[in-house]
Amino acid sequence: MILVDMSQIMMASIMMQMHMSKKNEPEEEMVRHMILNSLRMYRTRFLSEYGELVLCYDSRHYWRRDYFPDYKYSRRKGRESDTKDWDTIFGCLNTIKDEIKEHLPYKSVEVYGAEADDIIATLCSEYAEEIMILSGDKDFIQLQRFPNVKQYSPITKKMVNGENADVYVKEHVFRGDTSDGIPNVLSPDNTFVDGLRQRPLSKKKIAAWIDHDFDDVAPNDEVKRNYQRNLKLIDLTYTPDELSEEILDTYRSTSAGDRSKLLNYFIQKRLSNLTESIGEF
């Protein structure tokens, strides 16, 4: 199966379109074409080896934010000071998402409380068939511990590989993830929210920790607690069991869209260039 991180594909398309048009709000028709053409292109490239597309979406609500309220705080804060029309951007993306679910012949998986990361990780841990993850997100490197899992970045147009998956996730947990608002294990929860500097964490210190049980080498109880915080937020094996079960139930019960709807949809949305390649969808 080809597991598509739809949030990344869709956001990359809309940002590229707005950059090209030099406007602060998207042109829905062009964004729609770019997203659909990306799916066509990746399906054509990977179908024969990995099978059909499975479209994985972020829920509007994340379990990680319940556990750690400052999760992805910097992204929310950044949007508040941005000149882009984010209401229109998200409205456009939601419209196209609904159209894709209704009209395209692929399984779409979205589960309340789950991010696409949780969906992709759950399916990778459950199925032994050949799997291609379409995402540039390095969080997925940890899933390459499964020998049947590969990853391709639509951003760099290259395979994502060359890392030891188990070492990578350990280092990632120690360092945290600035883009997701997760401080390193030496730093408190409020580091990014309150504009504090992270406490320095050297490569030498990480190397000294990596082959040990962290409880044996952590300098104090606060750092042990921060380690558990990061482990739960970053290591995808910590997706809650009940959520993983719901993801699997949703995947198994979801039918692919009706391919016969595709032509009428393309005509309705005036996707004439894509109509010529309809057999590739």
Predicted regions and their residues:
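Extended two-metal-dependent nuclease catalytic cores across DNA- and RNA-processing enzymes
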Residues: 49-50, 77-265, 269-281
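Domain-level signal for Mg2+-assisted phosphodiester chemistry and nucleotide/NA-binding surfaces
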Residues: 1-98
